Amino acid sequence: ATPSGAIIVSLGSEYAGLFSNDDQLSKQILNAGEKVEEKLWRMPLHKNYDKLMNSKNADMQNINYVGGAGSTTAAQFLQRFILNKTPWAHLDIAGMAFSKYGGALNSGGATGFGVRLLNQLIDENYE
């Protein structure tokens, strides 16, 4: 999923963004991606980005009006809904979801990015 599409500015169409509050989970996801050749880059997720979601009119806003860090702010928005430090991860696949030129698995269009990665992650760590 892609809450903002802003990850494309950072990573283009070569890597998907990985946001997580847990180093072990991040390592598992990165390893799974490497094995199936679906590239990820871990992006920052930090409480300092919270101030970008402060609102004068509501509990919070889901957009960063200051500018910059759009994908990180979107992931930090998701973080606000995680209870009790539950390990979680978000794959921002905006740059990887479609391919004009195709690749090893398709001739163009929707790529299915993340399906093999998540299958590998589950096979290695959760079955």
Which residues are covered by each model-predicted region?
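A generic structural signal for tightly packed, nonpolar segments enriched in small/aliphatic residues
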Residues: 1-127
